[in-house]
Amino acid sequence: MANMEVSFTHLGNHLVSDSAAAIKAGGSDELSNIDPDENLLYGVYGGRGPRGNGRRRHDDDDNETEVLDDDDDESLASVPVDGMKSLKLDAPVEEKELPPHACAYCGIHSPSSVVKCLTCNKWFCSAKGSAFSSHIVNHLVRARHKEVQLHPESSLGDTVLECYNCGTKNVFILGFIPAKSDTVVVLLCRQPCGASTSTKDMSWDISRWQPLIEDRAFLNWLVTPPTDAEQLRARHLTPPMIAKLEEMWKEAPNATVADLEKTAGVDDDPHPVLLKYDDPYHYQNIFGPLVKMESDYDKKLKEAQSEDGLQVRWHLGLNSKHVASFILPKIESGDVKLAVGDEMRLKYKGELRPPWEGVGYVIKIPNNQSDEVEVELRKSANDKSVPTECTHNFSADYVWKATSYDRMQLAMKTFAVDEMSVSGYIFHKLLGHEVQVAPTKITMPKKFHVPGLPELNASQIAAIKQVLSNPLSLIQGPPGTGKTVTSATIIYHLAKMSNSQVLVCAPSNVAVDQLCERIHRTGLKVVRLTAKSREDVESSVSFLALHEQVRMNTTNKELDGLVKLKTETGELSSQDEKRFKQLTRQAEREILQNADVVCCTCVGAGDPRLSKMKFRNVLIDESTQSAEPECMIPLVLGCKQVVLVGDHKQLGPVIMNKKAAKAGLNQSLFERLVKLQFTPIRLKVQYRMHPCLSEFPSNMFYEGSLQNGVTAAERLRKDVDFPWPVPETPMMFWSNLGNEEISASGTSYLNRTEAANVEKIVTRFFKAGVKPADIGVITPYEGQRSYIVNTMQNTGTFKKESYREVEVASVDAFQGREKDFIVLSCVRSNENQGIGFLSDPRRLNVALTRAKYGLVIIGNPKVLCKHELWHHLLVHFKDKKCLVEGPLTNLQPSLLQFGRPRQAYRPQRSHTQHVASGPSNGRFAAPLTAGSVRDYETGSMVSYIPDDVSSIHSSALGGAALSSGYPAMFSNFHPEAWAGLPCAGPNGRPGAKGRGRATESIAGESVANSEFTDATSSVIGGKGIGQGGASLGAGLSEAIGSARPTSYSQSDRLKQYVESNGRMGVGNGYRRYDDDEKSVSTAFASQIGTGFD
């Protein structure tokens, strides 16, 4: 197989076979003759493969470089970039001078196996070594490069891979389509060209579009894998060495492998966080460097976010400030993360007027309605010079500020040097010391219900009693248990009983606003302190904001007069401005001192306006989403009574720097106290979900302790006509076997089959009368989020406005929120790459607990069931008869049988011991003991940042029709010249069809074969199967990819099924992929039609 030469001729953007017949003849038996060592599945289940050690680690990061994120310690992303202390370079036996086109990693230089990166001009090969990504794909992802060129001596010549229609060169969105009547392969981008309606009239079958990158490597017929002998002779770099080399190239592009030895002894890993600390200086010495690491990383990331050549639209905001609207391509590619309130600098460098620059704040980020960023410029003396008449030649820079990190460092310093910053008891508890609480006499309120809030249940009242009588309390609020109401009630009683102010904080502005609104209902005097940069951002509690209360305060006539003068004229004289600021500060102090409750973010608690104030009572909501130093900011303002509210079984803090996260900066103070056996008070009655939806999360994550405060009847929308498998149980897992693909950014994933079926489900809800605002679509991957948004807009049969109003976002964006109906798209569908983000139990817990009336999960159960947690979930759905497959109009119970997962899952119990109040369930295994808790990384992802450049601009490019005219040179080619080409019927006769007709799939409805399309072919993961005809996987891949090792992809399994007359046999010592032969055989038979021959 390795010696077989594959010859192609490159004609424009068509790839034409010169030796197809020889390929077909030589590759007929390759599937059964591959050595087990070459099988990618071999290492997954043990032996000498990369996963043979049996250990797993989840190492996601907020930059969403999920393509390099595996579940094993040998993967490229699971190893730190640094940590080179013990690295050794394994040089080849005979080191000699390598040609310029040698792989920059390993030195392999076979022309057919190397590819040139057009961004950095380095060459890389298709070898994988000990990782799961080929060297070229690994480099493209890590370096954020996307354009490549083949070697001049390769069979295709020095081809630059690009779309035949629009010319885009992003390899992550490029794929190929075989022509129906010509012996050519056409390269098209996934969107818009590969999905353009104008393509349907062409001689190309767009349902057969396949990506050029599969299994994290270029297709074998495009870039040949090196032989075993070449790999043995090559330089062997470990994944940490490759990661370090990529980092070196960012600073020194000409660095070589030899330069790695110079840094091999450097080990600058920070000291990990501890459970206990000797004193506050010890505490500061541990956390201080971690905060600095995160700060430096954030600064480097933000300062690299410069964007040139922008087109800007101008308009005046309601406050008469200039607003600039523009699209940032780097946001769409996932390289830039923006949030409302971030500061940006706009510059004009055109020729129509003198250079200009202005600074403003982000007031809008891309969402379903618009891909634009909106920046509101700050008022300045030269407002008239804003170039509103210009629209081109602008640039944008991110203005990085160290405010958040400086306040964390200052809080830790204050904790160390100021004895009055916290009480003695809190001081010792924060350091992890054993200390007895001093007995205090308090008079409990006669009734705990407060005006303006709902009645409390028994567990809420118990929590409030315990909080009021203890100086430090943790409240664990599982999903839907009313922790916001409980927190607001606690704040009311603390304010009334202690007759002192309460400081209320949370890590996000959204969480602060929600709690602030509830507290206001109780009648307490509340002030919402916001950052200066967010004063113009609309919120539900704007009327409570400090700056707004100052503006509305008319008791100070002088200040009122200056406010009106400034509003009318836009500016004040220097003397008036000085007096205005003085009077404003006085008014702010008065309002703050007279307030019962002050609400702000944790970082906002470090605002200088609060520096002179002392807060005896501090409550931090969503504290499990705050890094510990962030929580310290509000605590060092004199607290004597602290309440931390959160849920350590849901998502944790977002830490950008992997080394800092690995050292423990991603652990919240709440979690550390739990590990110190400080038992949280758990709220036990959930009011959100239908009881069938709360059963699994309760048993798996909360030891069966959750009780239902709502009945099944109260959470059943009988007015909604939806094909639930069990009408009284509004949940289902819809089996979809579509393959995952890499998104345009190269750092995320998408699944076209799942996206198409999400649209079908949303449309069905619309037709049943569900409002768009009541539907939420959750997906862990930004690539899928962007693709779903565009799929609904482009193919949805309902009103376009309705689809735009459906929120499509990441799990993180939905934490703390709820929708009537939730659709969860799992995306991951592969044989040996793992399931990435999905393996995080805390992320799954959040995703499963957002829906009130119904939950639909779309995923590939065959892949997901290999993970222990998902295995339990799938078995649960199957026991409830809610695991289904087939078209949405005719769902059938899945026949899938589950084997044992790779590792038995045990829910984390940490150090808390809660007695389960619900009935025991033998399906959910007993928790581990405290000493054997397994830790899971919970890296997070920022949502609402468009990723697929192509999908964002599909509206702009979609009108470009594909040329129907082939070059004249193709007139000599006929289908008979290539017997394996899918367009040729049996015996090479064009247009001939097999007997029988294709039936609808029961393996999840395909993209093409649905009630909303008129296409005659079905799709499994984008591989089209005509009525009785051969599939792309069974035809073209056999002809042009016979050298491909067995991967058990959809096409390979389909091919094996066809060739074995309907039997999915076990190949030469490989583990059989399908545990349930009947299910898969039935699925394939329905896709192909019974008359296939």
Curated annotation (Swiss-Prot):
The Upf1 CH-rich domain, residue ranges: 95-252
Residues annotated to bind Zn(2+) 3: 163, 166, 189, 193
UniProt EC number: 3.6.4.12, 3.6.4.13
Gene Ontology BP, a term: nuclear-transcribed mRNA catabolic process, nonsense-mediated decay
Binding residue positions for Zn(2+) 1: 103, 106, 125, 135
Amino acid composition bias (Acidic residues), ranges on this chain: 61-75
Region (C4): 163-193
Subcellular location: Cytoplasm
Gene3D superfamilies associated with the record: 2.40.30.230, 6.10.140.1240, P-loop containing nucleotide triphosphate hydrolases
Family: Belongs to the DNA2/NAM7 helicase family.
Role description: RNA-dependent helicase required for nonsense-mediated decay (NMD) of aberrant mRNAs containing premature stop codons and modulates the expression level of normal mRNAs. Also capable of unwinding double-stranded DNA and translocating on single-stranded DNA.
Protein name according to UniProt: Regulator of nonsense transcripts 1 homolog
